């Protein structure tokens, strides 16, 4: 009887870990998880406005990626570089110098910053935690994010 309970408990632990229930959330197929959020790199280049619209169409609550710590930015760099090599991805910031209270396109507060210049829209390098200002009409790759 004791062995049956032990085996049953072991199977339950395995099932919970495979289902994502142990972590409390599970991202859709093709999306990567970090700190209760889901992320996906898209190998398509588009301007900032089209990229933000594209992200909102990928999943409910999805927007261009926002960063709230250097660890989160490192996670995205580690996710994007193998796919895109040395390049830029749009992040969810635009027109930040025209606003008193800057926020990400997903509505969250701008509480982590890593600027490298000044312009209308912001792109992040795929090889380091560094943000670059770019004309919003330029085309770059897309990383979308939503809360799981």
From Swiss-Prot:
Glycans are attached at residues 47, 78. Residues 1-23 form the signal peptide. InterPro entries: C-type_lectin-like (IPR001304), C-type_lectin-like/link_sf (IPR016186), C-type_lectin/snaclec_domain (IPR050111), CTDL_fold (IPR016187). It comes from the Eukaryota. GO terms for molecular function: toxin activity. Keywords: Disulfide bond, Glycoprotein, Hemostasis impairing toxin, Secreted, Signal, Toxin. The keyword Secreted applies. The keyword Kinase does not apply. It is found in: Secreted. Interferes with one step of hemostasis (modulation of platelet aggregation, or coagulation cascade, for example). Heteromultimer; disulfide-linked. This is Snaclec stejaggregin-A subunit beta-2.
